[in-house]
């Protein structure tokens, strides 16, 4: 698959999947950014729906719908979707580019070896490293959008959630320090292991269950891509959930935490070890659905794009041939 083709199909598919489950993503973020009442600050200014703690995602979605209507469930969706598109475009672009370059280099290094059987594929560790490299690059581009999106999701009023107001509030609260828009970057960089685990797991599972199609996701059916996406995302989410919770706490409205270690230590001391996996069920639900849809959409988009390129090439060649005949 071409690098640009991979980036475009991956980005479009991820944006479509994000829109499909956005209310769940919104509720999940709010749940993860909640703190226990006993340790709340004296002032509730900027907190998520002051004096309210949601029991679960369903309770959160119902109450948001009652108070804000259907649009309340899509608060901050525009920025989140743009951030998702950009992050995945950059990720898939660099992942495909780095992986192809690495495999080319590896293949050249093995050309001198004789009796090599079967295709050359990266090991699980190599897939993880390649994924981390690509995800780290994407984090640098999209961290500010993630900060704005999380703030939009966790403020109470629709007025405060407006894009320009969020930008102004973050800038003012940090005394003009522009690095505040990269708050949580360290956690984000640590979380690059999440998509790395996801895509490494996807590649390994694809080789195990669909060995004949291991080099092309576009050759799998939408159902096959969906199942592999679900399984691979479940693995990565369970491993990295504490960091996901810490990132939500760092970037939420009214957050007083400055590092993910501080946020995790606070949770452990005040709410116990179990709280480090707070919201893991909605995170898993959202994650596996999005990842499943992403791989399914991406596979179908890849097939559609190839068909369009083929039709365009056929039309161009036919039209060009007719012009040459006419000129003679």
UniProtKB/Swiss-Prot annotation:
> Which compartments does it reside in?
Peroxisome membrane
Q: How does it sit in the membrane?
A: Multi-pass membrane protein
Where are Solcar repeat segments found?
Answer: 1-101, 122-208, 220-304
Where are its TM segments located?
A: 1-21, 78-98, 128-148, 185-202, 226-246, 277-297
Transmembrane helix is among the record's keywords: yes
Q: Which InterPro entries match?
A: Mitochondrial_sb/sol_carrier, Mt_carrier_dom_sf, Peroxisomal_Ade_carrier
Expression induction or repression: Induced by oleic acid, through its ORE-like (oleate responsive element) promoter element and the PIP2-OAF1 transcription factors.
A Gene Ontology annotation in the biological process aspect, one of them, is: ADP transport
The family assignment reads:
Belongs to the mitochondrial carrier (TC 2.A.29) family.
The role this protein plays is:
Adenine nucleotide transporter involved in the uniport of ATP and adenine nucleotide hetero-exchange transport between the cytosol and the peroxisomal lumen. This transport is accompanied by a proton transport from the peroxisomal lumen to the cytosol. Transport of ATP into the peroxisome is required for beta-oxidation of medium-chain fatty acids. Required for growth on medium-chain fatty acids, pH gradient formation in peroxisomes and for normal peroxisome proliferation.
Miscellaneous note, as given in the UniProt record, is: Present with 2250 molecules/cell in log phase SD medium.
Q: What is this protein called?
A: Peroxisomal adenine nucleotide transporter 1
């Amino acid at each position: 698959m071409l690098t640009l083709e991979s980036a475009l199909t991956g980005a479009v598919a991820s944006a479509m999947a994000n829109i499909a489950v956005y209310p769940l993503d919104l509720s999940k973020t709010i749940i993860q950014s909640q703190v226990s009442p006993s340790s709340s600050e004296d002032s509730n200014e900027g907190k998520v729906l002051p004096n309210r703690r949601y029991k679960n995602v369903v309770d959160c979605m119902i109450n948001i719908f009652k108070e804000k209507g259907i649009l309340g469930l899509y608060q901050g969706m525009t920025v989140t979707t743009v951030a998702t598109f950009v992050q995945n475009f950059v990720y898939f672009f660099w992942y495909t580019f780095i992986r192809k370059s690495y495999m080319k280099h590896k293949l050249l290094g093995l050309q001198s070896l004789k009796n090599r059987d079967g295709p050359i594929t990266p090991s699980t560790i190599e897939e993880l490293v390649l994924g981390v490299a690509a995800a780290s690059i994407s984090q640098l581009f999209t961290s500010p959008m993630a900060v704005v999106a999380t703030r939009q999701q966790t403020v109470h009023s629709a007025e405060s959630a407006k894009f320009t107001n969020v930008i102004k509030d973050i800038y003012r609260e940090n005394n003009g320090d522009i690095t505040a828009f990269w708050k949580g970057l360290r956690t984000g960089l640590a979380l690059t292991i999440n998509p790395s685990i996801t895509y490494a797991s996807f590649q390994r599972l694809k080789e195990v269950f669909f060995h004949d199609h291991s080099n092309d996701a576009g050759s799998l059916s939408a159902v096959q891509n969906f199942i592999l996406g679900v399984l691979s995302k479940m693995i990565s989410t369970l491993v990295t959930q504490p960091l996901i919770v810490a990132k939500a706490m760092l970037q939420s409205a009214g957050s007083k935490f400055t590092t993910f270690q501080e946020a995790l230590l606070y949770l452990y001391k005040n709410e116990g070890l179990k709280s480090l996996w707070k919201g893991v069920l909605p995170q898993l639900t959202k994650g596996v659905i999005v990842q499943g849809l992403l791989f399914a959409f991406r596979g179908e988009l890849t097939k559609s794009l190839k068909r369009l390129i083929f039709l365009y090439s056929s039309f161009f060649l036919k039209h060009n041939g007719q012009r040459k005949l006419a000129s003679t």
